[in-house]
């Protein structure tokens, strides 16, 4: 037998889960588990990182899921105290279509049903997007366990039958068992779980539903429990010494198969059923080639489209098919023709009626490259909103970064720097050998930047536009301060410890060695040493021999980030505190290191915006945030800027440049 954890919270269950994704996979591999799920609370923030880390652990199949919140009433859009209640429910994607449906459910919760920070959906939304999803009944906050604990077996059975009707053989009842071993701590959770489990086993027999054992994982190893307890104190603004605060049982870690079997020895099938679930899951990719928005061409241009298609046939033919040989279609060809039309119009304005041979060849080369790589609409979109900005009197920067190397961008007035005159390379901006999305950073005056946002939203529609999420993590100093606060350490002592943490990298002089080759000379401070090294035996293929070689030994500067691990090793005062400080100081420093790097909050990127081809919830999970200027809710991607382009989305950076505002004023 083996076992798979299907109910797992990472640190993206913000200030509730402590597990680093890489640590989860490493532990799952160590325990020889064939798969591992991610089921964070109401979000998919960590999915891309989860899949990225999974590539390093091919033995462990990644399972994408979410613990969603389902309203107890008929409409998740009702937001008042009488409609605040919700249930927990686990959903797991069987394949890519299931992943898309999961994104729809999670996004709907954030866009329509968010209340008191809980993104809720009604049962009808779950049913609407249920295809290719596996469903588990969740913890004692789930609908079925709650009904059982309340003594309403009729309601529990009714809920089971609803879920079986919706999910069929992909619905599983879920049991958990967390008996705390902490002296003096209440066993209320465990007692409720025992009641719920008894009812679940009864309903499983009565309704023919399989049961899976889970452990509601919130941290990786048993010894991480006290650190997680401090994290919960941060979440609830409590002190460790508070008697009536929220507590976990400290049993919510990634337990081994043996530990799970010890709890569910009377029902070993609950472990083997997790393997059945894992076997239903396909390994699939969520990354895509670029999915650019469709740029609507003007009617007057389309009226004579055949002429333009013929005129620019050579350039169009360069990219008529994608890298797999698939036809890109008529819309693509029309976009290329319009891009060529605008570029050559702009070239006349920039260079005059008669271009030099160098100018003509450069523009044709760039257009063919843009067409071959499939990016004509990108340039059309950028030139459109820059032209709109200028027409509204918004100051636009001359161009920065590698985009200044594009003659096409110069002709389209995206930039105001002639790359031919200044001998700038186009290949730094766009290179056929590296299929990356173009990246044009555009400067606007501060007020104008927001007006450009508005223009794009009006042109493409609110459902195709999104801001980009950011994640704030606990840095070294804040981790010490946070742990010190919940430990009731004095402010003076907390400040004393944090002042020992440098703001800049720690620079050390360390020994280094390099081979000393014939013709080399020793510089000041270097000395020559001789060492025995192992090399390939030229007379014995596959064999090794030892020879003596010369090396130059010297001191070099090595820079370390001021993370707590490095600080404790390299800063004498902190080494002394860890060795001989008070128990309180040692606890604070040790637990701060365990919490350092945990995700603490989300934010919205100040400059980045996503423009999609259609409703963005078809491609990425969405959450919402309040616009700082208007107070209105805006869409925000649940994947951050590192991953947005990997899933095919067009991300643009609109930079507010104070200098432009000053010049304008």
Language-model features and meaning:
Residues 1-665:
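Alpha-helical scaffold/interaction cores of sigma-54-like transcription cofactors
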